Amino acid sequence: MSRKWLNKVKWDDHGLVPVIVQEQGSNDVLMFAFMNREALQKTVETGEAVFWSRSRKRLWHKGEESGHIQQVHEIRLDCDEDVVLLRVTQVGGIACHTGRHACFFQKFEGTAEDGDWHTVEPVLKNPDDIYAGKPGHNHE
């Protein structure tokens, strides 16, 4: 079986490609992660987002601990063929391990001299409740 579509992706020196995850409908950017060839292949095969966890050094099926899986509607490759975009339905409405809708919940406000990052999105569910009883969870 040919997998030439995998060869079109420009993988980095570690065999990874950056992935932007966008919510179908709202177009919110939910998160950023990485995939290796196997993760991208499994994502296509299952219709659910699978990433490569750099900290765990293994495949990471998004939602495997929290239940907040990402159902993939569309996969796109950018013009340089080195970034992947997933358009997903976020099950449970929570993409971030902090219990928020999206990982980009800190907003810069102010000037270059006195600016700071401020939390602008609420926690929808306490991470301790999301991951309670999950052995070895690290809220990724």
From Swiss-Prot:
Homodimer. Pathway: Amino-acid biosynthesis; L-histidine biosynthesis; L-histidine from 5-phospho-alpha-D-ribose 1-diphosphate: step 3/9. GO terms for cellular component: cytoplasm. Its EC number is 3.5.4.19. GO terms for biological process: L-histidine biosynthetic process. Keywords: Amino-acid biosynthesis, Cytoplasm, Histidine biosynthesis, Hydrolase, Magnesium, Metal-binding, Zinc. Binds 1 Mg(2+) ion per subunit. Gene3D superfamilies: Phosphoribosyl-AMP cyclohydrolase. Catalyzes the hydrolysis of the adenine ring of phosphoribosyl-AMP. Mg(2+) binds at residues 78, 80, 82. Pfam families: PRA-CH (PF01502). It is an enzyme of class 3 (hydrolase). It is found in: Cytoplasm. Its cofactor is Mg(2+); Zn(2+). It catalyses: 1-(5-phospho-beta-D-ribosyl)-5'-AMP + H2O = 1-(5-phospho-beta-D-ribosyl)-5-[(5-phospho-beta-D-ribosylamino)methylideneamino]imidazole-4-carboxamide. The keyword Zinc applies. It comes from the Bacteria. This is Phosphoribosyl-AMP cyclohydrolase. The keyword Nuclease does not apply.
